[in-house]
Amino acid sequence: MRHPDLPSSLTVPAAWQATLRLRFAQRGERTALTERRHQGPLLVQKPLYPEGGICHAVILHPPAGVAGGDSLDIDVTVEDGAHAVLATPGATKWYKSLGREAAQHVRLTVGAGARLDWLPQENIVFDDARARISTVLDVAPGGSAIGWDAVVLGRQASGEQWTRGALWLDTRVGTGERALWIEQSHLEAESPLRTAVAGLDGLNVLGTLWAVGEGATQELAEALAEQLPYTPELRAGVTCLATSGQSMLLLRVLGRQMEAVRHVMVDSWQALRMPIHGVAARPLRLWAT
């Protein structure tokens, strides 16, 4: 069936199918990017070492946006004992889909004694976009990972609202077959949950931060909670989830402005990095540009 906004004479552009495979391994005193394979417009910049032996890499998507029918597949493995920091240089824009779904699938695998910081910029969902964003994180015993995702519903800079479309957010965090946390969310632009007090309460920026590792304790969650804001415009909360052999902290942020939500997540990452990774936090140079 033709989308109602799509003229019959218009040819739907070809979709991008892009993949990126990265592997990091410890080589002597530092972590090296030992494998990089890509197909389509997903690339990684030359690794940098602003923190000694910790490998920093920036993932690039030159089109800068994801249109209907596009699919991005990112697979990252951090081998035993290695430490990688991954980021993106700018927001991922989810364009008007013309009735077709766009998707990004991320799989992160962290080995025993390995550490990962997954710090992408936010996702901006344009009006009439249909976006599916999934993340699977597998952390081996003794490994640790801190990461986040943020979504902005509508283009705040231009005043555009998100009035049509759909968003799927699927996340799984665990160790092998044992899951610590599974979430499958489906939000329609016209859903009453967007304005319900028990839902988004009219706010349009959602942030989630997870921290997995032996240091993810209830005491740490309580200490972090004391620093979090809770106002009509910016709300954050944290909880500790644990199973035999693994634990994690889950931080939720809901706000009206991306900048405010970003500050909460960055401040939380800085507070968590030492207890989770055993490494002091240093803000990424990328954030200052």
UniProtKB/Swiss-Prot annotation:
It is found in: Cytoplasm. InterPro entries: UreD. One of its GO terms (molecular function) is nickel cation binding. Transmembrane segments: none annotated. The keyword Nucleotide-binding does not apply. The keyword Chaperone applies. Keywords: Chaperone, Cytoplasm, Nickel insertion. GO terms for cellular component: cytoplasm. Belongs to the UreD family. UreD, UreF and UreG form a complex that acts as a GTP-hydrolysis-dependent molecular chaperone, activating the urease apoprotein by helping to assemble the nickel containing metallocenter of UreC. The UreE protein probably delivers the nickel. Required for maturation of urease via the functional incorporation of the urease nickel metallocenter. This is Urease accessory protein UreD. The gene is ureD.
